[in-house]
Amino acid sequence: MDLEAKVKKMGLGHEQGFGAPCLKCKEKCEGFELHFWRKICRNCKCGQEEHDVLLSNEEDRKVGKLFEDTKYTTLIAKLKSDGIPMYKRNVMILTNPVAAKKNVSINTVTYEWAPPVQNQALARQYMQMLPKEKQPVAGSEGAQYRKKQLAKQLPAHDQDPSKCHELSPKEVKEMEQFVKKYKSEALGVGDVKLPRDMNTQGPNKMYIPGGDRSTTTAVGAMEDKSAEHKRTQYSCYCCKLSMKEGDPAIYAERAGYDKLWHPACFVCSTCHELLVDMIYFWKNGKLYCGRHYCDSEKPRCAGCDELIFSNEYTQAENQNWHLKHFCCFDCDNILAGEIYVMVNDKPVCKPCYVKNHAVVCQGCHNAIDPEVQRVTYNNFSWHASTECFLCSCCSKCLIGQKFMPVEGMVFCSVECKKMMS
C-alpha cells in the first residue's frame, strides 16, 4: 500500500467504546465519546483508559503489531481472517481447594497476564512479589491497573500511523522509520528466572555479580556449581538490595546478563510504574516504558498526545504542540496570536475562561477578567477597584486598607461588622 493510500485510510475509530461510563467521573459523564483529534472524551475530558471500555482484543492487536517484525514473533499469532498479528498473552488460572464444613470447594483465580514461563510455580512466585493492587487478577483493581498501563505506556499512536490525526505522507514515512529503529535497537521483553540460572545464559558465559562484563568459562572448570551458587550474591539493578535465594528475578536481554531486577522493581525510570507485561525499552542504561522512551527521542504534542514528526511546531508553557493543535481546550479555536489562560496545564481562550473558569467577584457578582487585577482572600475574590472591594456595611473602599473578612463579606471596622451581624 503506497503512502497516499495509507493517509486516506487513516481514522481514529470514533465508535470504539462509545457510551462507556467513566470510572473517574461516574454519573457526571454522559458516556465515552472520542474527541475528533484529542485522545480524550468530549464529555468529561478524561482519557479512554479512565472509561470502562472493553479493549482486550484491541489491546492484543496493538501489542501484536508492536512485536511484528521483531525477535518476539513467538508471542504473536496471525489471524487467519485478515492476517493481523495478535498478542498471545499468557493467561494463568490457579485452582485452590477450599475446605468447607461438608465438602471441598474449588477457588479459581485467573490472572489476565502472567510471565510466559514453563514453570507455573515460578510465575506464581513472581505474582506474589508484586503489590497486591497491581496483580492482574481478573475483575480486580490489579486488572484495571494493567489495562490503564497498557493504554498509557504503549499508545497505539506511537507505533501505528493509521491511529494518528492527518499525518502527511512525509510524516508517515518518518514515523515508520522511527518505529522500525526502536524495534531493532530498544524494544525488549523481560524474562523471569531464578538468579542462579543466570549462569547458564549466553554462549558459555557466566554471570559475574556486581560486574559489567561476562567471561568465557570452560564447562569442565565448574567443579562445584551448587557451591558456587550458594556463595554468589545477586543484587537488584534498581534498588541495589540483594536477591533472596529462590526468589524469581527479571532480566532484560538488552541490558545484559549482569543486571537483574526484583519483580516490583522492573519499572520505567520516568513514571516509575511497573512495565506492563514486562515490555521495556532500553536506552543509556535505563529502562523506559514505550511512552517515555518515545518522549526521550521525539517531541510530543500536548494537544493530540502524538509524537511530532514535522519540522515546524510550536513551544508554549514548557510543552510542544503541532501548529494546528495549539488550541483552546474548551472550544478548539486556534490560539496563535490570541490571549489565553492556562487552566490545569491546558490553554483556554479568554472567552471560554470568562465563561467556564473565571472566579466571580463578591462585589459586583460578575466574572473577573483574567487580565484584571483582583483581591483574593481564602476562596473569595473581588475586582481590585473602588467599585467592588468595599466594606459590606458602609461601602468604604478597602484597597490598601486593613479589613475584617467574614465569609464572603469584608468590613472596615468592628463597628461595621456588628451592625451587619
Curated annotation (Swiss-Prot):
Interacts via LIM domain 1 with ZYX. Interacts (via LIM domain 3) with ENAH and VASP. Interacts with ALKBH4, talin, actin, alpha-actinin, GRIP1 and PXN. Interacts (via LIM domain 2) with ACTL7A (via N-terminus). Heterodimer with ACTL7A; the heterodimer interacts with ENAH to form a heterotrimer. Its main location: cytoplasm. It is found in: Cytoplasm; Cell junction, Focal adhesion. Residues 133-164, 193-213 are annotated as: Disordered. GO terms for biological process: negative regulation of cell population proliferation. GO terms for molecular function: zinc ion binding. It comes from Ovis aries. Residues 234-297, 299-359, 362-421 form the LIM zinc-binding domain. GO terms for cellular component: cytoplasm; focal adhesion. SUPFAM superfamilies: Glucocorticoid receptor-like (DNA-binding domain) (SSF57716). Keywords: Cell junction, Cytoplasm, LIM domain, Metal-binding, Repeat, Zinc. Scaffold protein that may play a role in cell adhesion, cell spreading and in the reorganization of the actin cytoskeleton. Plays a role in the regulation of cell proliferation. May act as a tumor suppressor. Residues 155-164 have a biased composition (Basic and acidic residues). This is Testin. The N-terminal and the C-terminal halves of the protein can associate with each other, thereby hindering interactions with ZYX. It comes from the Eukaryota. Belongs to the prickle / espinas / testin family. Residues 92-199 form the PET domain. CDD domains: LIM1_Testin, LIM2_Testin, LIM3_Testin, PET_testin.
